[in-house]
Amino acid sequence: MLEGCILAGSRQIESTTNNSVPGAPNRISFAKLREPLEVPGLLDVQTESFEWLIGAEDWFQRAADRGDVDPKGGLQEVLEELSPIEDFSGSMSLSFSDPRFDEVKAPVDECKDKDMTYAAPLFVTAEFINNNTGEIKSQTVFMGDFPMMTEKGTFIINGTERVVVSQLVRSPGVYFDESIDKSTEKTLHSVKVIPGRGAWLEFDVDKRDTVGVRIDRKRRQPVTVLLKALGWTNEQIVERFGFSEIMMSTLEKDNTAGTDEALLDIYRKLRPGEPPTKESAQTLLENLFFKEKRYDLARVGRYKVNKKLGLNVGQPITSSTLTEEDVVATIEYLVRLHQGDQTMTAPGGSEVPVEVDDIDHFGNRRLRTVGELIQNQIRVGLSRMERVVRERMTTQDVEAITPQTLINIRPVVAAIKEFFGTSQLSQFMDQNNPLSGLTHKRRLSALGPGGLSRERAGLEVRDVHSSHYGRMCPIETPEGPNIGLIGSLSVYARVNPFGFIETPYRKVTDGVVTDQIDYLTADEEDRHVVAQANSPLDGDGHFEEERVLVRRKGGEVEFVSAAEVDYMDVSPRQMVSVATAMIPFLEHDDANRALMGANMQRQAVPLVRSEAPLVGTGMELRAAIDAGDVVVTEKAGVVEEVSADYITVMADDGTRHTYRMRKFARSNHGTCANQRPIVDAGQRVESGQVLADGPCTENGEMALGKNLLVAIMPWEGHNYEDAIILSNRLVEEDVLTSIHIEEHEIDARDTKLGAEEITRDIPNVSDEVLADLDERGIIRIGAEVRDGDILVGKVTPKGETELTPEERLLRAIFGEKAREVRDTSLKVPHGESGKVIGIRVFSREDDDELPAGVNELVRVYVAQKRKISDGDKLAGRHGNKGVIGKILPVEDMPFLPDGTPVDIILNTHGVPRRMNIGQILETHLGWVAKAGWNIDVAAGTPEWAAKLPEQMLSAPADSIVATPVFDGAQEGELQGLLGSTLPNRDGETMVNADGKATLFDGRSGEPFPYPVTVGYMYILKLHHLVDDKIHARSTGPYSMITQQPLGGKAQFGGQRFGEMECWAMQAYGAAYTLQELLTIKSDDTVGRVKVYEAIVKGENIPEPGIPESFKVLLKELQSLCLNVEVLSSDGAAIEMRDGDDEDLERAAANLGINLSRNESASVEDLA
């Protein structure tokens, strides 16, 4: 949040990217522009805000370097606000200071393992002063365990990794608005003074041209009443506002005479029904706006009010309440706005522009980052504690009081716990892949407490605004009800101390672009003229063209002379977020499709073997490193030892560092997080170099998918409507195979009938089923399991039942009590299978922390290898998504002239109307990168290659290239490179200069009639896997009321034969089929059992009974006081019996059917 500005050296344009990170792969870059600023730390929005909250040393260091920062930590600030707490008589006080932390209780991995919270004990110094005797008692007080942020910007709460999302809210301040009156068509003006905490103050000019005021959303009254209540006389009002007719007419209509009457009038409006007195009215008004305990504009509100009204400009902010001058200046501004004045002279003599505010402008919306959100929660907890302290001060003996006896920390601890556990802004971290986690931490949400609700939010607040430029990405936002309410921070953006988002610009002085970087808020940017990053410059930094394309306030674009330009963008990718900046040729994609592309990259699952894209954007390395899933060297040195589990580095200063790998760990979303070394023993490594790849990374670069040979053509209609045809090679060679890990948990508790027991001795289970269980009853690691298999054996005591005479005889003879237990073992859920890769056992005997009543807890991890299959969803990076419709044998796939079969066939119809042409350009450049190129310069450098550096005139096969957004490969360069690709080993060029090739049909060997676009596209396998969605049911749980099967895979439900399906049956006249479907196959409970019995006994199927839903319908009609009866054909009333049929009970018992099985808790209960 408070990061200082970094200046990079003025290096020449590099033909390779990733140069700032040692040991990084060499990606050939098509960028034409030099970027004077490195991409800042992508997690700074989280980490710096939390450092401010706890008052970390690093934060103080940064605060000292900048003048606009109040050098006080967030905890210190909130303790100073609270102190001193005085009793009602003012004879004693308690104050707090010096918050500090002890060491964290357990490391991150242990907290995840044992369901603990990653936290450190918080201590403060509490000082009790007896004002009567002057006695001071000081103590260090424990204030509870405070959740700490990990290095990755996350929190571990009860063993799960969570992220606190930054919240976009309307800033406290003063806002002027304009509206048209529907009846008179007059332009009306109003103003709201919005505090951080406290009552709203609203002024408005109505259609009768009087100025009114609303205090705390109560009834409107003339504004002069408020001025008189503040001590103003009629003469003073005339002297200050004599220039305004509407103020004079308001004064004439005001019936109050003097301050006392005005105060009483306000009191009557605010407290109707209570007897008004001058003192109580005076106290009420002061408490509402002028007492810090009740009213808080916040530092940012004070700053905004001063800026808008031109008060105390340039002076340090001290007070955070309203002043009389604020109220008067606000009224004058409103009156002048209504008069149509352009400027107003502020009390300090400065000229202030008079204009209406745009509430959606980023100058009026600020960010509550994680530190401020937690600080607000602590403030709530401390204010609850304050009440307890005051009560204890009055009840306890003064001599015996110490700070410890007064303080109850429970409200503070509860407030923090409540925030992390239940707040809308504390979210379960998206760990699908490293990019999804990184984007989650950089997310900006307008929802949450104090924000908008998705039902109330209109189109204006959701829309892209010109002030978003360089601050919030205009592309990346969810589809659906949250569109525009949730955004993503732009690549270079940072947050200033007031919570406004700033973006960097290069300073332009007298038409010369310098390397000085200034961070501007949206308000400041409106005052300047800004040129775009790709404006051509000469070697000295002068603009090459006399007229430069710039943007002014409100996003207006025009050409101006170079001397008028104030600033220039630092980078073409300045306006987009990290995920959007990873889409090559973004500039050729329609924004709607780019939105889908950015979102779908976050849904890519980590594959068994990651592969970095042939065509990247240069953002892949920074994204992967900052996401924190790769292992990075802390100090330069030499690799001493490498194994699959750890890497040891001997640093140059003689210290030894061991880096542990995460091996096949389960992420929050069930994907596999595995790290593997990419360095060798004896290798020299520099500080910041990547030692080991994580999920979805290759050589330290983000690698979300695979480079596949794609042909864009229709194929027998099998790829109609975005369906995709795949080669069987991708299945056989595990190209798109991913590993998914599920966690299954069971606990043994104390019950009323005795303790549950985890055991191998399970009643009525064959030895075959128990074969893979160890002596404790827990499955062995490495066992292959499928649905229904026992993972952990558990028995639960059953209540004593009435014994049969035979059992009583056996007990009398043998004297032993039959074990009354039932099998409640943990079984593999329906539709799942895999290999057991890990087991964790927690036991009270081993002193593990377990919930009350739990004696033992067992977790089993089952890994499943999922090959790509029909029904899985694939996508490119341009919003081009589809479901696999057919997997063809390799020999049936279309092939190139040299016999190379393509991997994937996409339909041509997926491109034109979607306007995502970037996928075609990526396909062409992918082929160029895979084949390599050599530009013929014998007759001089071709015109299209004039801007390419010398190193880029040739490249070997399997090169990796970068085409940064808005500064990438040009169309002419792409065409030229396609004509310069290297031939294959037979000396033939497979793809023509237009990017098309002659393809042959794999089945007939005949060439297709037209050339086909062929190249390499980066394809992602998304988390929407068919294995998670496919589902079938024979019998299962029923709804308690209607007795119909439940719906959905999670409930093990069935397919609903709905209204339209019934119509279809009626149309065909299939009466008996329809009757069967509506009764015995659905909710005729008696009929169901009788049919089952008939099938078992081989008898004819009996007549259906009455469906349960018909009985429910009758009851509902009767509940509406309608007397509904069912009559037979002869007019006799038919009695509806409620399933107490003895025959039914008997038949069910004989067949072993449990008729009480309703809304089963789990699939295992169905057995």
UniProtKB/Swiss-Prot annotation:
It catalyses: RNA(n) + a ribonucleoside 5'-triphosphate = RNA(n+1) + diphosphate. It comes from the Bacteria. GO terms for molecular function: DNA binding; DNA-directed RNA polymerase activity; ribonucleoside binding. Pfam families: RNA_pol_Rpb2_1 (PF04563), RNA_pol_Rpb2_2 (PF04561), RNA_pol_Rpb2_3 (PF04565), RNA_pol_Rpb2_45 (PF10385), RNA_pol_Rpb2_6 (PF00562), RNA_pol_Rpb2_7 (PF04560). Keywords: DNA-directed RNA polymerase, Nucleotidyltransferase, Transcription, Transferase. GO terms for cellular component: DNA-directed RNA polymerase complex. Its EC number is 2.7.7.6. SUPFAM superfamilies: beta and beta-prime subunits of DNA dependent RNA-polymerase. Transmembrane segments: none annotated. One of its GO terms (biological process) is DNA-templated transcription. Belongs to the RNA polymerase beta chain family. DNA-dependent RNA polymerase catalyzes the transcription of DNA into RNA using the four ribonucleoside triphosphates as substrates. HAMAP family: RNApol_bact_RpoB. The RNAP catalytic core consists of 2 alpha, 1 beta, 1 beta' and 1 omega subunit. When a sigma factor is associated with the core the holoenzyme is formed, which can initiate transcription. This is DNA-directed RNA polymerase subunit beta. It comes from Mycolicibacterium vanbaalenii (strain DSM 7251 / JCM 13017 / BCRC 16820 / KCTC 9966 / NRRL B-24157 / PYR-1). The gene is rpoB.
